[in-house]
Design a protein with these regions (language model features):
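N-proximal low-complexity "stem/linker" segments adjacent to membrane-targeting elements
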Residues: 1-43, 47
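Glycine-rich phosphate-binding loop at the start of an alpha helix
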Residues: 46, 50, 75, 163
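Active-site nucleotide-sugar/metal-binding loop of Leloir-type enzymes
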Residues: 50-63
Length: 203
């Protein structure tokens, strides 16, 4: 039986060309039953993800695959995620923070979270939704609205919607994984001075 996947790509009217080409390859491969849902101009991020959650539950697909519009997963990325047969799994998506690239896959440490640098398939506490596959059982167990911004007590900062969703999923007993061999392109603007400083520090 073909895997059935509801692909959700929230966007602001643009997706990467590389992502469009990968979607075309998946659609024409005949390997999957796919639906692509691309809600535009819904902000903030947690609202867009909750819309995707709601629309997914109206359909009969087994999996929801979130892809960020500025990401470029490899063509074999979907097969890799499916092959793990776990409830929540994503690839490695890097972001730039404090002058260094870090994976958006984290483990809890004390009262906060720290990036986790793993190998192969490893369990984490939080993973970005930039390229993440979620089984229907998770999305049926969690109410629509489970993606939410979590404010810090003093209101000066907060946790993004992925943190809150992952916390709620773990509270329901679901495990979260990152495939550290699945590298996903992520287009980000950054200050090249920071790159230069990082190279000097590392050299």
């Amino acid at each position: 039986m073909q895997p059935s996947i509801f692909i959700a790509i929230p966007n602001l009217g643009y997706i990467r060309t590389e992502l469009a080409l990968t979607l075309f390859r998946w659609l024409t491969s005949g390997k999957y039953r796919l639906k692509i849902f691309m809600p535009m101009y819904i902000q903030p991020h947690h609202r867009a993800r909750n819309v995707c959650h709601r629309e997914f539950l109206k359909e009969d697909y087994e999996w929801l695959l979130f892809i960020d519009s500025d990401c470029a997963p490899p063509v074999d990325g979907l097969d890799r995620l499916l092959s793990h047969n776990v409830e929540i799994v994503g690839g490695v998506v890097l972001t730039w923070k404090d002058g260094a690239p870090i994976p958006v896959a984290l483990r809890k440490k004390g009262e906060g979270y720290v990036p986790h640098y793993g190998t192969r398939l490893e369990e984490v506490d939080v993973i970005t939704m930039a390229f993440t596959l979620i089984h229907r059982s998770v999305l049926e167990a969690l109410p629509v609205g489970s993606f939410a911004w979590g404010d810090f007590p003093d209101g000066t900062d907060g946790l993004g919607e992925e943190f809150v969703f992952c916390q709620r999923a773990k509270e329901r007993g679901f495990k979260i994984f990152c495939d550290y061999e699945l590298l996903v392109g992520h287009r980000k603007e950054l200050e090249l001075l920071e790159v230069n400083q990082a190279l000097i520090k590392g050299g």
